[in-house]
Regions:
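Non-catalytic, surface beta->alpha helical segment in thiol-disulfide oxidoreductase systems
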Residues: 44-79
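Pre-signature/interface helix of ABC/ABC-like ATPase nucleotide-binding domains
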Residues: 36-39, 59
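Conserved redox-active cysteine motifs that mediate thiol-disulfide chemistry
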Residues: 1-14
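Short alpha-helical
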Residues: 6, 33-36, 68
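Thiol-based oxidoreductase modules, predominantly thioredoxin-like and allied folds used
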Residues: 11-36, 43, 52
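Pocket-edge positions in alpha/beta enzyme catalytic cores
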Residues: 3, 29, 61-62
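Short hydrophobic/aromatic-rich motifs at helix boundaries and adjacent loops
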Residues: 5-8, 42, 46
Length: 79
């Protein structure tokens, strides 16, 4: 995430809606202020999402997507 990133701004309301519907926490990390976070997970672009379960990264996704694709992605890991 970065404040200047158009696709990041575009998916923000989608992610907020998903967080409410699924009762999950979605945290944003500003890559301008935390540049090492990109390399830690091997990302080359934003928006980049990492799915954690019990403190471990279990999957990741890069790029803006429509809500059904995020729901499908999360559905692999939760009901």
């Amino acid at each position: 995430w970065a404040p200047w990133c158009g696709p990041c701004k575009m998916i923000a309301p989608i992610l907020n809606q998903i967080a409410e519907e699924r009762d999950i926490t979605i945290a944003k990390v500003n890559t301008d202020m935390n540049p090492l976070s990109m390399g830690k997970f091997g990302f080359r672009g934003i928006p980049a999402l990492v799915l954690f379960h019990n403190g471990q990264a279990v999957d990741q996704m890069t790029g803006a997507r429509p809500k059904p694709m995020f729901d499908q992605w999360l559905g692999k890991y939760m009901n």
